Amino acid sequence: MYQVNTESKGSLLSLRQGKEKTIWAVGGGKGGTGKSFVSASMAIHLASLEKDVTLIDADLGGPNLHTFLGMKDSNLDLGDFVTNKVPNLKDTVILTPFVGLKLIKGTENVLFMANMNYYKKMKLIRHIKTFDAKRVIIDIGTGASYNCIDFFLLSNPGILVVNPEPTSIENAYYFLKSCIIRILKVVTEFYGIEDLVNKIAVHIKDNSKSIYTFLNEIISHDKNSAHILFRALKRFNPCLIINNARSERDFLLGQSIVDVVKKYLVVDLNFLGAIPHDEKIHTSLKRLTPYLSTYPNSEVALSIRSIVEKLAYK
């Protein structure tokens, strides 16, 4: 089903210009949710449909996407661009075993990349936005650092991968909340209503207060500013995938999370579906054989194909 590429895996690419691009960013707020497996699998299936997909490993300091693709290490990685060893992001692109799928491998320079400064980050974001590929999928790191949040907000949409466990759900919720804080701070500064910035930060970080409650308070003081903030949040439409679902309750969990996020964070979260648990995923990883290639008709593969096609052709 997934055609193997006959070109050299290490070749660099000269990419064409001028195509409309979609960027998906896959995160989770917490490690161990399976986001890298989901990112790699989505990219493999999308490439089989569209033949022009680039996968970027932006999990700074802990790159592993190449392993999920059945590849060994390469000489070039994202750090070579960020540290100016190569002038353009496209210079770090390598071919994968899958036709239509390219990879930008993450860097293992933990200390440098995890603390990438603002100017280097903005340079990377500019290059990603102008990168010549029809579809770009970014596997971002864990946690709620500005780097993770800004890569997530760069996308259209950002995709949260969550396990049906309390800690994973809680981390995803607070990751979304951090994204909203980031959006509101940027918007207030852009529109010259900086007097709200400190109030936003103090109020929203109080876990007893919801975004909805806060915005209603703003309406009572400044309706125009509240309208600006509501409008900004309406443009933030993240998506949700439940991974490692084992029970019927796990498969139904997504809609419950959507309802809570809408009620307390005033954001429309789009539930894409659930991916069932399968021990063979770990077996495939140990053997360096991509799961979708080995088990193309499994329930996991069917779920991933459904999610990708829902996202790509909605």
Give the predicted meaning of each segment.
Residues 44-56, 74-75, 184:
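Post-Walker A helix-loop "phosphate-sensing" segment adjacent to the P-loop in P-loop NTPases
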Residues 38:
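Hydrophobic positions on the alpha1 helix immediately C-terminal to the Walker A/P-loop
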Residues 1-32, 41, 45-47, 51, ...:
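Extreme N-terminal, non-catalytic leader segments
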Residues 58-134, 190, 204-205, 231-234, ...:
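P-loop/Walker-type NTP enzyme "switch/lid" segment
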Residues 35:
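Conserved lysine of the Walker
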Residues 60-62, 109-111, 143-144, 165-168, ...:
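Conserved nucleotide-binding/hydrolysis micro-motifs of P-loop NTPases
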Residues 285-300:
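C-terminal boundary of histidine-terminating zinc-finger modules
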Residues 141-270:
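Conserved catalytic-core segment of NTP-binding enzymes
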